Amino acid sequence: MSSALSIGIKKVRFPAFFVICYLLSAISAMRSWLALFLIPSIATAEWKVVDRQELNAGSSQAFVITVSDGSAIAKIHAAIGHPPELRFRVLNNGDRRFSNVREAVSKSEALAGVNGGYFQPDLTPVGLLISQGKVIHPLERAKLLSGVFFVRKQKPALVRAQHFSDTTGISDAIQCGPFLVENGNRISGLNNRRSAPRTFVFLARGGHWGAGICRSATLAELSEILIIADLLPNGPVVSALNLDGGSSTGFYLARGDQSISSPEWTTVRSYLLLSPSVQPQ
């Protein structure tokens, strides 16, 4: 009796064991399926404009744009205009005479401004810096410093650092990086782990140039945000270069009694200002 009972129990246990293994295998397969199909669809959710505020500032326009991918929200502050009505210039702040971007814009009689390029703790510039035709710091070869924004004969331009060599006729320049948008396309391989305030300079379709900040996004997210087709009424962004970010990120625009302000948290070495061009008498 005991032997028969023992054998009977064994016959029941073995099928149960296999059923459990089968269920565990099925659950594992289902997890793999979810990872394959659902997670990528969440990760690649498209960013869309959910709110836009505009301010006409004479020869330029300013925007405060809120975007979302369904799970995260970022806010863009940007000023944009069309040269030659709008002039870009780099303001050197090596003597610390300006404590913030608002002061730099106001005292320079500019329309708008953002912080400029990278710098050391003692405010020594990192990368090429040219202000008012004077080379403050020379070009550097470094992976991070992949682009140069410069102005020659009041015409702004953005190029890869390896394609830049001649400073003749350049009035203003900032070397920084990485590129965020190139030829209307996002840049692959950008960091997608660290979210922080960002500053950038950009070219939009139709020859419109601008500068702005984003609070707050990873470099990869900002690259995706800047190629949103209806981000700007002037047309999509064609090219964009990342400037110094984090605590340096600051934006200010004033038009009469109206202003848009998102201040930085530290003293910076340089500013990129947008000013009305001097009209001939």
Question: Regions from the language model: what does each represent?
Answer:
Residues 123-143, 191-242, 247-281:
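Conserved, well-ordered active-site substructure
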Residues 119-192:
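Active-site-adjacent helix-turn-beta-strand microarchitecture at beta-sheet edges
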Residues 23-24:
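Short polybasic linear motifs
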Residues 7-17:
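Positively charged N-terminal leader segments that act as targeting/secretion signals
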Residues 44-140, 212:
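Zymogen propeptides
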Residues 13, 30-36:
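Sec-dependent signal peptide recognition
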Residues 69, 83, 150-155, 182-183, ...:
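Short acidic-glycine loop/turn motifs at beta-strand connectors
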Residues 40-42:
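N-terminal signal peptide c-region/cleavage motif recognized by signal peptidases
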